[in-house]
């Protein structure tokens, strides 16, 4: 019986990381700061649990996949949810009228809610 409890406890610990879910992009604001350069303010929601499981970056991508900009998140935001961070200097090719913003966490990688946004002035 004791071994059943140990197995159950191990399974519970292994599954705990999955409960935080994937990192979701919930809002994006884009501003042109000159020429083909833009600033992104991105709001994420993720149930950060600490250094082992937190949203560690978000990216601006072209619809066909190339990454145009990455904002690294250096620490967990356990007590600050949702949270907004900015990235300036994102170069967007002239032919793109929309981009996709996606978030990444240390356990699940990509896969949460993404936001497709129109590029101002295009």
Language model: regions and residue ranges:
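N-terminal signal peptide c-region/cleavage motif recognized by signal peptidases
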Residues: 15-17
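A short, structured loop/turn motif at beta-sheet edges
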Residues: 32-36, 60-67, 91-97
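Short, solvent-exposed, Trp/other aromatic-anchored flexible loops in extracytoplasmic proteins
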Residues: 69-100, 104-109
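Residues lining hydrophobic/aromatic ligand-binding pockets adjacent to catalytic sites
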Residues: 59-61, 86, 113
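The feature marks short-to-medium sequence segments in extracytoplasmic or secretory-pathway proteins
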Residues: 53-78
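Bacterial N-terminal signal peptides that target proteins for export
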Residues: 1-8
